[in-house]
């Protein structure tokens, strides 16, 4: 059985530039801040956003970090590990739900092997993150499902991107699913099982896989953990 902890919780920081000054909005909860960002794009000439995912620590037979985050999160992740009595060298594996920069950019200070689906290594996002990741030891996942360790399974959950994966982690409280950006930026469509957009059919299939696991808890990339 594994213990699941969030090392760095998700947050979004939205800012606007007015009269030569940067104004950071106080709202940082991920879904609400995303809605604010989209609204402000129609109201303000210069608006920006940066976002951190949930960075998750799995402790059991192996010590695994899932989605370390943006490059600027290298030091915070190391410090968060230290508060739990861990050094970077204690990490056996980094797992990327997908290879977008906000999930895959903070691997350097951990220096552990990186597991990512092989489809992501052929995606446009690999142009941005691949140079760093290929300096590390890559574990290229292939196919539609597999096991990273006893008690940690993965399944391909396309929709957000083709090589996206989700994890099912066995814990004493029941299965915990880490699904990256397969769900989000909000929960409403997942709760109703009615995805929208050009990848709706793929997302619905991915959501059905997640529900079929019967999770006690779901941790998405940019949402607070929830029980489905």
Predicted features along the sequence, with ranges:
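Zn-dependent metallo-beta-lactamase
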Residues: 1-61, 206-209, 214
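Core dinuclear metal-dependent hydrolase active-site scaffold
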Residues: 3-9, 56-59, 144-172
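Active-site metal-binding loops of divalent metal-dependent hydrolases
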Residues: 9-11, 63, 68-71, 99, ...
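Active-site-proximal loop/helix segment associated with metal-binding centers of metalloenzymes
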Residues: 25, 32-52, 118-145, 186-193
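Metallo-beta-lactamase
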Residues: 79, 86, 92, 115-156, 162-228, ...
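Short loop/helix-cap segments at secondary-structure boundaries that form the rim of catalytic
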Residues: 104-111, 123-127, 227
